[in-house]
């Protein structure tokens, strides 16, 4: 099964959307194998978003991500990366379809509630930034036999 990294950003936590987002993840047949709420350090935020370091919005992004608690998760399932990106919707909420997390809840491209890895390489890198291997669980959902061929 594929794993991906998902973060409910500080705006999602502050607006009480954590339970709604987790519910949507689980209803799609994905499972959460690691979960933590914490305030991400500046160093971790810079490492996580290092591909944006030269962009003008980088300082604001780091400031926002470190401004309050966020919820980090490792999500696992068949095509987990693609499925999570579909659950989240387009990065810019103006382009996000209704029924997606961002389409339903995001207010602005800079306050778009949630992050998910966009590739297997990004998922592996982001999971390693936020979790030790020993923090990632391994279990089977009782309905897995019905969910996957």
From Swiss-Prot:
It catalyses: a 2'-deoxyribonucleoside 5'-diphosphate + ATP = a 2'-deoxyribonucleoside 5'-triphosphate + ADP; a ribonucleoside 5'-diphosphate + ATP = a ribonucleoside 5'-triphosphate + ADP. ATP binds at residues 9, 57, 85, 91, 102, 112. GO terms for cellular component: cytoplasm. Keywords: ATP-binding, Cytoplasm, Kinase, Magnesium, Metal-binding, Nucleotide metabolism, Nucleotide-binding, Phosphoprotein, Transferase. Its cofactor is Mg(2+). NCBIfam families: PRK00668.1 (NF001908). Major role in the synthesis of nucleoside triphosphates other than ATP. The ATP gamma phosphate is transferred to the NDP beta phosphate via a ping-pong mechanism, using a phosphorylated active-site intermediate. This is Nucleoside diphosphate kinase. It comes from Methanosarcina barkeri (strain Fusaro / DSM 804). The lineage of its organism: Archaea, Methanobacteriati, Methanobacteriota, Stenosarchaea group, Methanomicrobia.
